[in-house]
Amino acid sequence: MRNFSAPVNLDCELTEEQWLTLLANDPDAFNRWEAGQRLAVQAALRFIRGQHNPKTEAVLGSGYLQAMRLVLNHPDLDSAFKELVLTLPSETYISEQLESVDPQQVHAVREAMRLQLALSLQAEWQACYELNRVMGAYSPDASSSAKRALSGMALSMLCLAAVHEGTSIWPAKALQAFKDAHNMTDRFNALIALVISGHELAAQALALFHALFKNEA
């Protein structure tokens, strides 16, 4: 299907290599998004059904990671589309594809996938964060909103990778971004990046957030 955006369930008999080709190269946005979702779900289901350990084994293959690298680096894809494609399928959707659901296992596998994306694409996430930061006065236009969403995703990934590697550079940058933010979107993106990463600076950001807004209804 091409130029399609409404929810639809497709039953396509394509190989993993064909899905990877679509994800990396298809000019149609819907096909690219669908390929990414299919590949991520297939990887999660294969991992869960095989009873693998997400703490010691990789969930995502090198082909998928390389395709996502191409998406992030692509100069002609807009920020909104990149953020959409890089968003993994939800735990709810993954669970719906299983005959028997263990919520904790599904959560652990999806978190392992996020960490793998964070660690494998660190250079791309850093470039993405710097390129999509919106400086100056707040503007609610579509382009600025898309850049804020993508830079927020990049910051979350960088904080996640930093915590895993035992460094505080990106969590410290997230805290500074929280303090310097001139709008709620940027402030909340920085807060979420810290909280999701589990870094100790999240407590400081939450305390600051409470102090700033405790008197607002």
What are these regions (language model features)?
Residues 1-217:
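Long, ordered, helix-rich scaffold segments
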